[in-house]
């Protein structure tokens, strides 16, 4: 076996008869080139559509290559069959040659003469064979040059393999780093799960608090309805009290006019009584004079009495009758005078009662005015407080709506990030599937190339066997030159057949070389196209990812700004909470003051009730201790004048009370309207709180979905790690770049996961802040509800005071009505007394006229009147 030495610029490779190693190195070089091509093709699978197109193209090219490889295998099989048939024919020829040797040995003696001719012919044949051998050597030199080129490629492939091994080592380090990062991410995920559980507990607690708040709000609504009903009743009672005051004012004016008339009538009655007393004195004086005259006439006419005894008896009887009549009239007049005195005393007592009642009414009116002023102040303070609370509630509602809008924006951004994450996960999965398919296709191509390498090695071995067989046949021919004269024709035929077969083999080898060169050119062109497409795709993806990175940076900036705005709003809300707490303290102080005022009013009411009892007892004592009629009349005149002034004051006070009641009614209407508005705002605030709670529930459900997605992504990351390990084990050389690409994708996914976790934390913090704000708003609503209840209590107390005032006004009106009835009765009695006085005067005039007539007759007739005891 001869050895040949081939040198290259990088190394020298020794090839011997065992050229299988060189051919296997060629197959390894082809495998390296194909793996390099597959590696470059895998780099083009970043985008889904471009990957699909490239994969289809590669599959079509692979199908073409498989068809060509099948054709080549068929040709190699045909060549193998031809070589087998040639070997069998050679064996047959060897058998025939052995037979021919025998024949030659037998015919050696016969063919000695023809040896020279055959030797010449044999020399010609040897020349032909040498020419053929030279041609075969040229072909072998060409094959050796191609083998050297392939060896150079093998050297380059070994260098690339070393580089890939280095990349693999770096990738293993990165994989370890990624494993550590996955462990850290799993820890973070556990922390997030704990945080989600805490949020769920907070959500349950918030739901319980919300249900309690809804129950309290329902109770407050019921209380508001009751207070509105009570307010309506109080308004009706105020209207009735206003009407009663108007009626009392009218009755008071009528009573004042009647009192004036009674005063005039009392003056006339007093004058009449003076005249009657003067007339009675004169009548008594005249009676005494008449008695003296009678005594004188009695002494004078004693003598005549005896004469005129019968006449005197008649006259005396008449005088006695007249005297009895006069006495009866005097008694009647005295009775009338006593009745008048009694009426005067009764009127005096009633006037005193009226004065006491008027004083009480004045006191109650002053108390009511003070209470009304205090109530007006309280109503104004409560009104201003309610306005402030409404303004604060509206501001809180606006802030809550702004916070909800910000939360909605954050939610939309979070959903977009989740969708991008899902799209990346889907793309990663598709890339993994494509990588698996490409690895399978690469394994198939490697297997087929290995089979082709084996076929090439087998063909090379057959060629070497043929060369050996040719050499052996040449030696056998040289040995059998003397004995091959008879087989020369057959040898010539064998030569021709061998030439034909060698020509066919050469043509087949040339066709194989051309086809291999064509395939190599086509693969290089496809590789160039794939590299161009890969560069274009890489540029496009670079731009795409740069745009996505810019968008992510913009979203991060927006989120930072939103975070700053949220912090500002939190500061503003904290300041508002401080202001609300200060306002709450002020309202509590005002409530305490109102309670103190209410206690003072209660004490005043108790004192007034005690004074009322004392006045009743004093009135009874005053009724029992009546004075004389004249002093009572004079005091009655004085008190009537006082009553007139008091009545005028009462009218002014009544007008003032009416105006104040109208203003209080208007204030109460405004307070009711504001209470209705506050109720509606509270309802709206509760509706906003319910919507915020519902959005909180939705956000928590969304966070649970995100946790599920996170778990699925973790499982996908684990699967990717397993697939990466499998790809590393399967790809050996060309999978490093794919691993690096997948590692970059995993890093991107991890960065996206970190971003999503950060956003999730931010959203959770925003949710916690909104929960705190909702709690604060609920606390404010509770405080406002308490203030509203306090205001309702104060309104109830005011209404109770108004009812008391109305009752007192009704009692005063009843007393004024009673006084008016008494005055009217007194007027009727005075009229009756005046009538009786007129009758008494007329009767006195008649008595005087009769008395004058009787005196004149006595002087004319000298009649003596004897007075008998």
From Swiss-Prot:
Keywords in alphabetical order: Allergen, Coiled coil, Cytoplasm, Motor protein, Muscle protein, Myosin, Thick filament
Region annotation (Nonhelical region) ranges: 1-31, 856-869
Domain of life: Eukaryota
Keyword Transcription regulation: no
Subcellular locations according to the entry: Cytoplasm, Myofibril
Family designation: Belongs to the paramyosin family.
Record's protein name: Paramyosin
Organism (species): Anisakis simplex (Herring worm)
Gene name of the record: PARA
């Amino acid at each position: 076996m001869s050895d040949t030495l081939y040198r290259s610029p990088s190394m020298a490779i020794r090839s011997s008869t065992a050229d299988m190693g060189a051919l296997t190195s060629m197959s390894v070089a082809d495998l390296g080139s194909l793996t390099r091509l597959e590696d470059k093709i895998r780099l083009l699978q970043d985008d889904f559509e471009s990957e699909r197109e490239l994969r289809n193209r590669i599959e079509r090219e692979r199908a073409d290559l498989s068809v060509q490889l099948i054709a080549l295998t068929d040709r190699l099989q045909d060549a193998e069959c031809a070589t087998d048939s040639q070997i069998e024919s050679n064996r047959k020829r060897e058998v025939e040659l052995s037979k021919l040797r025998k024949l030659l040995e037998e015919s050696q003696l016969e063919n000695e003469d023809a040896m020279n001719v055959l030797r010449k012919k044999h020399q010609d044949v040897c020349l032909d064979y040498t020419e053929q051998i030279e041609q075969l050597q040229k072909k072998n030199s060409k094959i050796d040059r191609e083998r050297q080129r392939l060896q150079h490629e093998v050297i380059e492939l070994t260098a690339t393999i070393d580089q890939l091994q280095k990349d693999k080592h770096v990738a293993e380090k990165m994989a370890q780093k990624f494993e550590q990062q996955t462990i850290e991410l799993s820890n973070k995920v556990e922390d997030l799960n704990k945080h989600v559980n805490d949020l769920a507990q907070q959500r349950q607690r918030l739901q319980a608090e919300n249900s309690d708040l809804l129950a309290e709000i329902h109770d407050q609504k019921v209380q508001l309805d009751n207070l509105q009903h009570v307010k309506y009743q109080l308004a009706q009672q105020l209207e009735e009290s206003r009407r009663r005051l108007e009626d009392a004012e009218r009755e008071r004016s009528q009573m004042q006019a009647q009192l004036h008339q009674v005063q005039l009538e009392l003056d006339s009655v007093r004058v009449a009584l003076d005249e009657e007393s003067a007339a009675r004195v004169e009548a008594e004086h005249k009676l005494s004079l008449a008695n003296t005259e009678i005594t004188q006439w009695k002494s004078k006419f004693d003598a005549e009495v005896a004469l005129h005894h019968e006449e005197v008896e008649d006259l005396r009887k008449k005088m006695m009758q007249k005297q009895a009549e006069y006495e009866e009239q005097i008694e009647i007049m005295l009775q009338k005078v006593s009745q008048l005195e009694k009426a005067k005393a009764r009127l005096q007592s009633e006037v005193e009662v009226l004065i006491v009642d008027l004083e009480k009414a004045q006191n109650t009116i002053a108390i009511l005015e003070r209470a009304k002023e205090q109530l007006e102040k309280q109503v104004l303070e409560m009104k201003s407080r309610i306005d402030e609370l409404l303004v604060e509630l509206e501001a809180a509602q606006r802030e809550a709506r702004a916070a909800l809008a910000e939360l909605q924006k954050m939610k939309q951004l979070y959903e977009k990030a989740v969708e991008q994450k899902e799209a990346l996960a889907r793309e990663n999965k598709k890339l993994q599937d494509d990588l698996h398919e490409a690895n399978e296709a690469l394994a198939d191509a490697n297997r087929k190339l290995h089979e082709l390498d084996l076929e090439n090695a087998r063909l090379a071995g057959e060629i070497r066997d043929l060369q050996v067989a040719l050499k052996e046949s040449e030696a056998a021919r040289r040995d059998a030159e003397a004995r091959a004269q008879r087989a020369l024709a057959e040898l010539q035929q064998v030569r021709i057949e061998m030439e034909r077969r060698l020509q066919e083999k050469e043509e087949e080898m040339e066709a194989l070389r051309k086809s291999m060169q064509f395939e190599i050119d086509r693969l290089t062109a496809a590789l160039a196209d794939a590299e161009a497409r890969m560069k274009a795709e890489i540029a496009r993806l670079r731009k795409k990812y740069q745009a996505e990175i810019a968008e992510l940076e913009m979203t991060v900036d927006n989120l930072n700004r939103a975070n700053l705005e949220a912090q500002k709003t939190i500061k503003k809300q904290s300041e508002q909470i401080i202001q609300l707490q200060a306002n709450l303290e002020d309202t509590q102080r005002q409530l305490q003051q109102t309670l103190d005022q209410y206690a003072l009013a209660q004490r005043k009411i108790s004192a007034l009730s005690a004074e009322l009892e004392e006045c009743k007892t004093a009135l009874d004592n005053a009724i029992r201790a009546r004075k004389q009629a004249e002093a009572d009349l004079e005091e009655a005149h004085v008190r009537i004048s006082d009553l007139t002034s008091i009545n005028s004051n009462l009218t002014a006070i009544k007008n003032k009370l009416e105006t104040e009641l109208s203003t209080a009614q208007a204030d109460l209407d405004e307070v009711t309207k504001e209470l209705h508005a506050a109720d509606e705002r509270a309802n709206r605030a509760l509706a906003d709180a319910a919507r915020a709670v519902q959005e909180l529930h939705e956000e928590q459900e969304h966070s649970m979905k995100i946790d599920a997605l996170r778990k699925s992504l973790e499982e996908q990351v684990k699967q990717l790690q397993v697939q990466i390990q499998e790809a590393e084990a399967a790809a050996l050389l060309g999978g490093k770049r794919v691993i690096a690409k997948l590692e970059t994708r995993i890093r991107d996914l991890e960065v996206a996961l970190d971003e999503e976790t950060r956003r999730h934390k931010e959203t959770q913090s925003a949710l916690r802040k909104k929960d705190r704000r909702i709690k604060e708003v609920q606390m404010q609503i509770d405080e406002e509800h308490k203030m509203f209840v306090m205001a309702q209590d104060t309104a109830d107390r005011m209404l109770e005071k108004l009812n008391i005032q109305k009752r007192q006004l009704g009692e005063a009106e009843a007393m004024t009505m009673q006084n008016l009835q008494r005055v009217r009765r007194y007027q009727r009695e005075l009229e009756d007394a005046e009538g009786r006085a007129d009758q008494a005067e007329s009767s006195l005039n008649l008595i005087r006229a009769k008395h004058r007539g009787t005196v004149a007759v006595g002087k004319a007739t000298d009649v003596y009147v004897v007075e008998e005891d």
